[in-house]
Amino acid sequence: MSWRRGLVAVIVLVGLIALGVLLHRPLLRAAGQVLVVDEPPERTDAIVVVAGGTPTREEAAAALFREGGAPRVVVSRQLVSPRTQRLLEMGIRPLDFQGESVLALEKYGVPRAAIVTLDEPVAITETELRAVAAAARDRGWRRLTLVTTPFHARRVQLIWRRESGGAIEGRLAVVSDDCAPGDPWWRRRRCSEAVLHEYLGLLALYLRISSLMR
């Protein structure tokens, strides 16, 4: 009888392995798709370049601006690391992250007068969107376009709903990215790290411990 139980266990194990081989691709692809939010473009009061990924997000934001998507583009002041701050002070690096973002927007055709720079330094997406929401309330903006990467979009949407209190609409616009959700992203280290980072970020958001994961 023991050999029969062993045989059954082996058959079950082989079956599970075969099932995993057959289903891992659609499951992983679905895991990537869950993170993506991409909404049809509509005219809003401002286009927000969610910090990171310069100049890709700036290029997409500038394209929306040129198409009449909004009369202005908003750029946050991303906190720089001590190492980057030293490079700035030494003159080795001429611009901080916000300065690079502004210059990229200008290169892509956005007039400086149409670029709104926020002064408050922000370290994570939550504090960034909180600052954006505060700026929107102060200026009377009711609708914004939030530009980010595909895998970052779901978390941005959830954070925005929390920080805006539902009073200011935030529409997601995702950029073309080399980590496309439909591609086998799990075969590329950077893309795999991005997906893992987003799921950890969603968990931290749910547990309200994002400030501990800087």
Where in this protein do the model-derived segments appear?
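A transmembrane-helix-recognition feature enriched in membrane-embedded lipid enzymes
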Residues: 188-214
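N-terminal type II signal-anchor transmembrane helix
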Residues: 1-38
